[in-house]
């Protein structure tokens, strides 16, 4: 049985917010430089996307659609539009705060930090994934551990370990960035060094002259055959977005 939305069920990589062009990385770039450039281009200055999310479980498959708006590094709104049981559920990231709206409760709730690692909408993504760039860059120390060639691209593999005393979920992350700026995969390890899950860019297309991961999949290692896949239906970048969009009032009562 799939979980219905509640403050305990959280969000994904926002379905396909853009990973834009990263200038070809060089050995002169530090691991942090490579990651920062990739994350800076993840959403452009602003973005709007329509995406679908497929949650595959042993007892069935669930499909949802959503709209996502982003502005800068710290503003994002995700609003589910279908199916009817999920329509109206929404998540707002504003700075370091994350809010959720459940239309059945007609209430906006600010998530505590302890809830950020929980499942979003019953998927394999979490609210923690919303604030990927800010938390990864600031909370971890980054080392370029490998450069390899694959599919006509150089792949820069970066190991990120948490800074001493910083409260984080993961004991380590391994991130791979292509030389064109696509975040190719992310591996997540627990505190004892065991890999827990992996997110991969499974399909990459060129949109507006940019390499764009139109299909991203999260898989949990101890759940073979199960996954959550986010597929981009349409997207646009560097657009004007009114400031009211990223407010708690609009989260609860969206304007047309």
Say what each PLM segment does.
Residues 54, 71-73, 81-83, 96-97, ...:
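Solvent-exposed coil/turn segments that connect beta secondary-structure elements
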Residues 24-28:
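Sec/Tat signal peptide C-region and signal peptidase I cleavage site
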Residues 30-104:
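N-terminal mature ectodomain segment of secretory-pathway/periplasmic proteins
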Residues 14-23:
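Bacterial N-terminal signal peptides
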Residues 136-141:
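Surface-exposed beta-loop interaction hotspot
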Residues 104-132:
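Acidic/charged, solvent-exposed loop-and-adjacent secondary-structure segments enriched in E/D, K/R, S/T
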Residues 107-110, 131-133, 151-248:
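Gly/Pro-enriched, hydrophobic low-complexity segments
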Residues 2-14:
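Bacterial N-terminal signal peptides that target proteins for export
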